[in-house]
């Protein structure tokens, strides 16, 4: 349920523990306990945003700019998304998109 709410609200950059607890009808302490193994609420939200960005980048019909994608998944800017993506996945979004398209084309 927490993941579903985050996924629906990805573009909302004000999404935080308080609003997530309200939307999921969980107490803040319960929510924080649930996501503690993932580094806390903020880290969990960022991970969901990064996974959404990775999914979109892997799609062969993806044509949005990095700035548009950043906005869609709740990052403040393309550079913020790019840095977070590199930190999390070990490659830049453009590198990932190229690799995903090359891999998809080899089947």
List the model feature ranges, each with a label:
Residues 1-42, 58, 62-73:
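DNA-binding recognition helix and immediately preceding turn/loop
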Residues 61-99:
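Sequence-specific DNA-binding recognition helix
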Residues 2-6, 49-57, 85, 89, ...:
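Short hydrophobic clusters on alpha-helical segments that form packing/core surfaces
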Residues 19, 45-55, 94-107:
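Short, basic, alpha-helical segments at the C-terminal edge of helix-turn-helix-like DNA-binding modules
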Residues 39, 49, 61, 89, ...:
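Residue-level detector of secondary-structure transition/capping positions
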Residues 31, 53, 81:
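Short hydrophobic/aromatic patches on the structural cores and recognition surfaces of FHA
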């Amino acid at each position: 349920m927490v993941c579903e709410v985050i996924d629906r609200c990805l573009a909302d950059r004000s999404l935080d523990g308080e609003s997530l607890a309200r939307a999921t009808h969980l107490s803040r302490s319960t929510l924080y306990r649930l996501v503690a193994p993932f580094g806390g609420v903020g880290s969990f939200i960022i991970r969901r945003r990064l996974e959404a960005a990775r999914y979109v980048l892997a799609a062969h019909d993806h044509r949005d700019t990095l700035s548009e994608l950043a906005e869609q998944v709740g990052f403040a800017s393309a550079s913020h998304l790019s840095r977070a993506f590199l930190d999390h996945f070990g490659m830049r979004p453009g590198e990932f998109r190229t690799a995903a398209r090359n891999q998809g084309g080899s089947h």
